[in-house]
Amino acid sequence: MESRHAIREAAFQALFALATNPEADKDAVYAEVLPQDTEVPAYLTTLVEGVLSKQADLDAALTPQLKKGWSLSRLTKPDLIILRLGLYEIRYEEAMPEAAAINEAINLAKRYSDDQSAKFVNGILANFIQATPQA
């Protein structure tokens, strides 16, 4: 598993599995989402551990981007996980261009949700970037 796209997709699947069953063993989850006899890529661990450890910060940054009256609990689980993953890459993976992180999140939404969700994810992440002062 060499492509970042495939690793990102595996990270989404692992995060979804862990959100569904927080008691699950991460190594067992990685074994489920990776092809058989595949070593766990370092970037997969970085994404999963990063999103989990920064989840409160990510959620706090996402909440103001939602429309009035909306909360994170109202989002579907796939959409929330995709938003967290995309925002994690935007905020913490400096080598990842913001536009690429958004594009990857949109692709995940198209695959694991629907076109409406893809537009929603695009809007939320783009709004976050616009609202964030550039260094």
From Swiss-Prot:
GO terms for molecular function: RNA binding. Keywords: RNA-binding, Transcription, Transcription antitermination, Transcription regulation. One of its GO terms (cellular component) is cytosol. InterPro entries: NusB-like_sf, NusB_fam, NusB_RsmB_TIM44. Coiled coil: none annotated. It comes from the Bacteria. Pfam families: NusB (PF01029). GO terms for biological process: DNA-templated transcription termination; transcription antitermination. Belongs to the NusB family. Involved in transcription antitermination. Required for transcription of ribosomal RNA (rRNA) genes. Binds specifically to the boxA antiterminator sequence of the ribosomal RNA (rrn) operons. HAMAP family: NusB. This is Transcription antitermination protein NusB. It comes from Lacticaseibacillus casei (strain BL23) (Lactobacillus casei). The gene is nusB.
